[in-house]
């Protein structure tokens, strides 16, 4: 068992099984369909986890996110998906893609169930040096209580907004309007788009290293998308990688300034409804920034 599963078992959880993921948690899809419409994708990479919760096979499920692999499937399947702050949940024993970008997340149908499970797995783990100590002992009381203050939100309308389908854009704008004075619309800094490039460099470079033995020995059996990502990752140099990693701290500090005046950032979870067919699991672009920065998403 990986550390997360061990913690759940020791807390009395009944582990029902292993859900389907995309190949090595990348873009080559499995056979899982969307429980609301079997002609559509459930998203990826945590396809089976989102579908299992949405179809009432399980009240909660575990997934992982290196780009948009928890938030996007949750959106497509109509359940709650939570990707915590980097370092809150151990990745020990989980199939690795990128030590810098990998997060373990949780799916559920209610905030109460989400909190109930999360409090058991947010723990510092000496086997995963990225983890930190953080107390969540009072989380059940917090989720059941009303906010102690009037929350203020910020919405960044980035260049990615143009990729949102018309109906989703219309619905999200109506949602923003409904919040009224509780939300402020701000243009993202011009350097915002650079984050997507940096994330790709780290992601693909790390995959090229992590999966090198599979690529060298079993390339013919690997999916096309994974092979292409590994080959792109092998072309980046040390300077590219160092810049992408160092810039992460710079951008993180920039975003922390936002929270001097606002409590949360609002953004779409996906580019729209789940795409037709199973080959394409959808775009992760509305999660990329928060995964790169290690910021929590729900």
Describe the predicted segments one by one:
Residues 66-92:
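Glycine/threonine-rich beta-strand-loop-alpha-helix active-site module
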Residues 1-67:
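Gly/Ser-rich catalytic/binding loops embedded in alpha/beta enzyme cores
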Residues 9-18, 58-59, 213, 236-298:
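Glycine-rich, small-residue loops and helix-cap segments
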Residues 23, 162, 273-275:
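Short glycine-rich, flexible loops that bind phosphorylated cofactors or substrates
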Residues 83-169:
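A short helix-breaking turn/cap at a secondary-structure junction
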